[in-house]
Amino acid sequence: MTVSKTVRGLLAVASAGLMALSLTACGGSTPGSTTSNGGAAKLTTIGFVAVGPEGDWRKANEQNMQDTFTKAAGFDLKYAPATNLDQKSQIDAFSSFVDSGVDVILLSATEGSGWEASLKKAQEAKIPVILIDRGIEPDTTSLYVTRIAPNNVNVAKGVADWAVKAMPNGGNYIVLEGPAGVGVVNERNKGFDSVFAGQSQWKKVGSQTANWKTDEGKSVTETLLKANKNNIQFIFAQNDEMGLGAIQAVQEAGLTPGKDVKIATIDGTKNAVQALADNKLSFVAEYNPLFGETALDAVKKTLAGEKLPAYIEVPSTTFDSPEAAKAALPNRKY
């Protein structure tokens, strides 16, 4: 990024911040509306190439970004959700942001591959790109500033570690995966498999995408239960919605979730935590979506010319019992 681009964005943030401070001190109007001499404040323009509707986790994450990058904070956030999770619509939005000369692009990709040309275009235009949640493949770190996300590999390892400890005798298990080609899916498989690969007491009897959806999680689980004559002891659902669908399938098969079949999920949405409190899920690994403030800090530091690490990990927690779930529910934000 050139000095001029950095300075332009930094001055915009600083100008808006000083204006807000001045208005607060004087008891003036809403921050972000005007400067002290009556002119409009210069806002830092952020192009957010987003995933769009994809379940409770995504809704919470993208709303958190929009609630953080406000005009009052000195930003003009241009929100561009994908059309039906279509990568082409994202690439078109990304290109439009580059052409319009936004100050920073936040990218949450529907698919990991296919971004090299777009990222090079932004680099040539001196527009910094920050990855939100999902990574890119190949992971060419020179093409973006940083990636901000919980650690998918470690989160999935946590699920596997819990399963090995909770069920020392092992058994048959299946995996409900997200859409093929998404980096998150590959990372979660990598983390989970790194633990289960050395566990001879466990046998993988099925793995199929259910596209992050409850209804597909149910139908895929139904199919795999029938194929294995209900002889499945553990289900790893790579997100909460698929796990909630698996609960329905297990119950309709005449089995008891949590007793006959243990189900573990990733995300930590309120519905999943409630299902754990109700003994229908056995383990929920949080994948914290609320990192708007971390992204805001990264944007400010980037525009100030500071060097950031290639990856900024968002801390997350786990829930391993109904008691832990019940304690968390009153303050659950998503």
Listing of model-derived features with the role each one plays in the protein:
Residues 15, 27, 42-44, 176, ...:
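Hinge/cleft segment of the Venus flytrap/periplasmic-binding protein
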Residues 23-38:
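Bacterial lipoprotein signal-peptidase II cleavage site
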Residues 45-72, 78-94, 102, 108-112, ...:
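Extracytoplasmic "Venus flytrap"
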Residues 46, 90, 147-173, 216-218, ...:
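Hydrophobic alpha-helical segments within soluble ligand-binding/sensing domains
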Residues 79, 138-162, 175-177, 207, ...:
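Short beta-strand elements at the ligand-binding edges of bilobed clamshell
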Residues 107-124, 192, 206, 210-274:
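Hydrophobic alpha-helical
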Residues 117-154, 172, 269-275, 322, ...:
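Flexible loop/hinge segments that line or gate small-molecule binding clefts
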